[in-house]
Amino acid sequence: MSATGNMLHVMAGVLRDTRGKVLLAQRPAGKHLAGFWEFPGGKLEPGEAPLPALARELHEELGIHVEPQDGAALIRIPWNYGERGLLLDAWQFTRWRGTLAPQEGQALQWQLPEEVDLTTLAPADRPILQALRLPPTYAITPADVMPDQAGIWHQRIAQAIERGIRLIQLRLPLWSVEQVRQLAERLQPLAASHQANLLLNRDIDGARQLGAGIGVHVTAAQLDDLQERPLPWSQLVGASCHDAAQLSVSVHLADFATLSPVAPTASHPDLPALGWPQFQTLAEASALPVYALGGMAPAQADEARKHGAQGVAGIRSFW
C-alpha cells in the first residue's frame, strides 16, 4: 500500500539489540499522545524515498547511522488519528553505527517485546509490537479429532510446542467446551515455559477463566456481536476474516487475523480462493498482522511474508 491522498507516510524503525530487546521512545509533553511510547522515526519529506527518510530520522533522533539495505520490512499500518490518516511503515534493523543516545531530550528504553505493556504504546504502534511477538506459523487442530483421542492430541500438541510451534488454536468442534478447556489447562504450564500461546476457538469465557497464555480465536460471526476487545491485552485475540469489512472490524477487537482462503481447499470447496494478489491488497490495507490461511503449509511462510502476511496458518500440513 502506498501513501496517497491525505494519508501521511511515516517511517518507524524497530531497532533490536543482541539481547532481542527493542528500543522505544516516549512522546514528549505538548505533542499529540504525549507520554505514550513509540518506535522512533518520522514522516517523509517531499520527494524523499522511505528508507533514506528513516535513516535520516534515526540519525536526527538517536545519532546513529543505518544502511537502508540492512532494513527488513516488518509491517505497514494504515491508521486514522481523527481527521488525518497515516501509513506507519515499520522496518527492523539489527545493525547500526555510532553511539545511540537521545538527540531531542526524549526518554528511551530497551525492552523485550513480550515484556512491553501494550497499553503504554501509541495505538498505531501496538500492531508493530504484535508483529514482533507473533510467530511465522499458526497451527490449528483438525476439526475431525474425536474426544477419545484426547491423550493422543495432548501428546501431539506438546510435541509441537517442544519443536518450536508458538501459536496453536484448539479448534475441536466434536468436543464439549469443558473437554477443550481441560486440554488447554493441562498444556498451559508447558506452553508458558516455551512462551507459546494456546487459543480456544470461540470460547471467550473459557479464555477468561484460564488466564495467562490462553487466548481466543473468534469467528467472523462473533466479530459482528463484539463491541469491545473480549480479553485483556495480556491475552491474545485472533479473528477469522474473509473480506475487507471483517478485517476492518477486527482491528479494534483483535491482535491478529487470519484471511482465507488464499488457495482452494477441500474443507471449503464452495469459497473462491483469494489468490496472492488479492490477499496482499487486503492484508496491506489492514492495521493488524494477518496470517494467510487456506491451502497453506509451513514452508510457505516466507512466500506469505512477501505478500504482506505475518505468516501462514493451517491445519493438516502443520501436524
PLM feature spans:
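Glycine-rich phosphate-binding active-site loops on the catalytic face of alpha/beta enzymes
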Residues: 216-229, 256-270, 295-319
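NUDIX/MutT-family hydrolases
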Residues: 90-94, 100-133
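Conserved Nudix-box catalytic region and its N-terminal flanking loop in Nudix hydrolases
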Residues: 21-61, 65, 74
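Charged helix-capping and loop-helix junction motifs
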Residues: 153-155, 181-186, 271-279
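Active-site-adjacent beta-strand/loop module that shapes the phosphate/pyrophosphate-binding cleft
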Residues: 75-100
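Catalytic beta/alpha-barrel core
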Residues: 119, 140-142, 146, 165-179, ...
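Glycine-rich adenosine-cofactor-binding loop
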Residues: 139, 241, 273-283, 287-300, ...
